[in-house]
Amino acid sequence: MSFDIAKYPTLALVDSTQELRLLPKESLPKLCDELRRYLLDSVSRSSGHFASGLGTVELTVALHYVYNTPFDQLIWDVGHQAYPHKILTGRRDKIGTIRQKGGLHPFPWRGESEYDVLSVGHSSTSISAGIGIAVAAEKEGKNRRTVCVIGDGAITAGMAFEAMNHAGDIRPDMLVVLNDNEMSISENVGALNNHLAQLLSGKLYSSLREGGKKVFSGVPPIKELLKRTEEHIKGMVVPGTLFEELGFNYIGPVDGHDVLGLITTLKNMRDLKGPQFLHIMTKKGRGYEPAEKDPITFHAVPKFDPSSGCLPKSSGGLPSYSKIFGDWLCETAAKDNKLMAITPAMREGSGMVEFSRKFPDRYFDVAIAEQHAVTFAAGLAIGGYKPIVAIYSTFLQRAYDQVLHDVAIQKLPVLFAIDRAGIVGADGQTHQGAFDLSYLRCIPEMVIMTPSDENECRQMLYTGYHYNDGPSAVRYPRGNAVGVELTPLEKLPIGKGIVKRRGEKLAILNFGTLMPEAAKVAESLNATLVDMRFVKPLDEALILEIAASHEALVTVEENAIMGGAGSGVNEVLMAHRKPVPVLNIGLPDFFIPQGTQEEMRAELGLDAAGMEAKIKAWLA
C-alpha cells in the first residue's frame, strides 16, 4: 500500500519523532485523526492487532512530542498497542507488512528500530525492564528519561507489582503510564480531574510537596498530618491509593484521548523526581465504531472491509484444535461436576467461551497470572477436584517452577491442555510454541501426549483427565484439525505408540500433528511410519523393535530438536547400546520469526518436500 499524501497531509509531514516535534501543538488533533484513519486503512488491508492501537493514538503522539525519543527511552508493554508508535518512528510506509514474513515485527523489536528499547510480546515486563533502564540512565548521568506504558490487563500480573514494589524502594526517576481501556471515559474523567492532574503534576505543587517534606521531616506529627491531608485530597477524586502505597506519585485518571491535555500533564511530569504514575482512560477501538462496540473481536483482525463494519466469516470448514478442546471440555463437564477449568486471560483463544457460559461456577479466568493459575489448580486438585489448565505453550513457560514445585513433586492430577504448540505464525519469536516438550520432558512422572489428529486429541484429553497418578499434558497446534472421524472416548494405554504403515529399511517416528506430512514422506520412501503418541513415557519396547528391524530411524516433531521427543528416542537407543543412525527433524536452534505457519514450515523443512529432502541428503 503506497502512502497517500493527499489523504494524510499532516501525517505526511511526520516520518520521525524529530519531525513530529516541529509541528505546532494546534495541529496535533488533526495528526491524531489522520494517524487513526491510516491505521484503519493499513491493518484492514494487511491484518494485525487493531483495537489496542486505535486507543493509544493520542498517547503515542503526546509521548513522542514531549519526550526526546529515542534519546529518552519509551517502553511498551506487550506491544499490541504500539502500531501508532511504529508509524511515527520511521516505519510508516512499511506498516502494511507487519506480521508478514520478512515484514515489520508484530511487536516492538530491538533489532528493528532504535526507538524500540525493549523487545516484547509477553505481558507485564515493561516496569521491571524500565527500572533497570532508569537506573542505568541515572548512572550514565546524561539526564535521559524513562517511560513505560502498560495496559490494565498487563498490570494485573504479579511481575508488574513486584516491579512497582521495587521501584518504590529504590525510587528511580521514571514514569509509568497506565493505559486503562477497560471502560469508556467515565464522568470523573472530565474537566475537574484533568485540571487536578495538571495541578498535582505542576511544578508549584511538586515544589511545595517536596519542600514541605524537608522542612517538616524533623517534626513527625506535622509531617504525618501533611501526608494524610494530601492523601485525603487525592482520595476524594482519584483512585490511586494502591500506587501511592507502593511508592509512586499518582496522577489521574485523565482523558487519554485529549492530546493537548496529555501534553500539558506529561510536560509537568517529565522533570519530577522519583517514580511517577500517570493513569489515563482510553477506549479500545477508538474512532471505529464496530471496534469500540466489540473490542475483543477486533483485538486482532484478518484482512477486512472497513466499510462493512464486519470481519469476514470463516468458511465453515474444519474446526480448530481449540474448538475440539472446548467441545470436549463441555462434554466432559456435563458428565462430571468435579471438572474445573482455568485460563490465564485466554478464554477466546483457548476455545472456552461456550464452557464459560454453560458452567460459570466451574470456569476461572485468573487474568494474566500464569504462575497463580498453575498453583491454583494444584489447590483444587488437593481439594478433590479435577482441574484443567488451558494455556498456550509460550505462556506455560512463565509458570515452570509452579509446574515442578506445586504440581509434579506432589503428584497432583492436573491436566495441562497446551494450545499453540509448535509454529504459531504471525506473532513471531515471542509466541512460537517451540519448547514445551523440552521443558516438560525432564520433569519426573509427567505424562506428555502429542496427538496426530483431532480424534487422538480428544482421546488424549480424556486419558489425561482420568490419569490420577500425577500431572499430564496434551499439546496441540494453532489452526484447523485434519477432518478424521471422531470415535467414542476411551482411555489410551499410557506410553504406547502404534505402527501406521510397514515399510523397509527406514522408519519414521512421528510425534504430533505433522503426521500428514510424515505420511506422504513414508509413502514416497516406502518407510515404516509410527505414531508415537507419547513423548513421556516413551514406548521403549516399540522403539527397540523398530530399531532392530530397520537400518535407520527418523524422528519428526514440531518442537525444538534439543531436548525434545527425538532426543528422548536417542537416549533410549544409547541406553540399550543400539547404534542405529537417527535423524532428528524438528525446530532448529534459533528463535523462529514471523510468517504464516505454511511459510515457516516450508522454510524450516517441516513440510513433506522438506522432510524428504533432508532424509535423502542424510542417507546419501
Swiss-Prot record:
This is 1-deoxy-D-xylulose-5-phosphate synthase. One of its GO terms (biological process) is terpenoid biosynthetic process. The keyword Metal-binding applies. Binds 1 Mg(2+) ion per subunit. Belongs to the transketolase family. DXPS subfamily. Disulfide bonds: none annotated. It catalyses: D-glyceraldehyde 3-phosphate + pyruvate + H(+) = 1-deoxy-D-xylulose 5-phosphate + CO2. Keywords: Isoprene biosynthesis, Magnesium, Metal-binding, Thiamine biosynthesis, Thiamine pyrophosphate, Transferase. Thiamine diphosphate binds at residues 80, 121-123, 153-154, 181, 288, 370. GO terms for molecular function: 1-deoxy-D-xylulose-5-phosphate synthase activity; magnesium ion binding; thiamine pyrophosphate binding. One of its GO terms (cellular component) is cytosol. Its EC number is 2.2.1.7. Its cofactor is Mg(2+); thiamine diphosphate. Catalyzes the acyloin condensation reaction between C atoms 2 and 3 of pyruvate and glyceraldehyde 3-phosphate to yield 1-deoxy-D-xylulose-5-phosphate (DXP).
